[in-house]
Structures are given as C-alpha cells and as structure tokens.
C-alpha cells in the first residue's frame, strides 16, 4: 500500500497494472514562504504562476527539493505554467527532504514551496521566513492511497482493509483531527473537503 500526493503518477501506476483501488483520503495545500520583506513581491501575486515569475524576475533566491517527489513535480508544473525554466545561481537545489530544504531556505533567506502540514509542524526551523502566498487552486495537494492488484503480494488484502478503514468515517475523523491537539490546527483536510479539488 502506498499513500501518495502525485495524482498523475497514481493514474499511471494503475494504467501500468501494478497498482489498484485509487482512494482519495485527504488533502493539504502548498504555500510559498520567504523573507517577510518579500523582495520579489510575491504577496501581491494573483496566482502561483505569477508568484513564480516574480521570483525568477527578481533573481530569487528559490530553494527546490529537486528530488522528483510529489512536491517537486508540483513545483515544476508551476514553473512550466509560469513560462520559466528555473536555472542559474538563484535556483538552489537541495536533493533533500522537506524539513532540511526548509532549513536551507531559511539560511539562504530564500523563497520555498512548503506543504502546509510541514509548515505547521516545522516552521520553528525557519524563523526568518513567513507565508507570503497561498490559496491558488493549483496549490491544493490531494492524497490518494493505492494497493497492489489482487493476488500480487501476501499482505495485499490487509493493506486493502487498511485503506477501507482510512476512507471510513472513523478514519476520516482521525485525518481531519490529526495534529489539532498539539499544533492548534489540523494538519490535513478530509476526503470530503479534498473531493472538490480531485
């Protein structure tokens, strides 16, 4: 079983025959963070693509995970929509995970696209950054669960039952409430909310 936030890759895995049972389980969103002074002026952008164009025009800096993760794929989708080929000294590639990349963005006083869950949990590692842009529909980050096709692995049926639980009312309540007690807000939206973006 895999829980993933790259819908096109999920569809490809199913089409290629090595995954089944695509099940929407929830969402969060991406947000663009950067120095409060916002030298590129992305806070005034009307879309994520416009915000990215502003970063490129200002010469960044912009930190990218550059790791072909779902986050990196979304970032590259936005650069393409912006008509920008990100390259040069202003474009810093970490090849690292989200928290390490967020720390690097803080050290560089750079712009960075974080998922909202990581930001809520880890913003303490980036005290010099703040959320500057969010809310574009393209930044919604949906999560799906998939499982191996029937008979593919010994644990496949157990994995399918777990997906059914996660999609059940009780599983969805857990997702919607996850993190609320510790951080003061939930880290994810449930599938009912996410469905409008799927």
Language model segments and positions:
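Short, glycine-/small- and polar/acidic-enriched structural segments
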Residues: 1, 21-33
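Exported/periplasmic ABC-transporter solute-binding proteins
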Residues: 6-7, 12-14, 26, 35, ...
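Hydrophobic/aromatic-rich structural module bridging two neighboring secondary-structure elements via a short loop
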Residues: 13-21
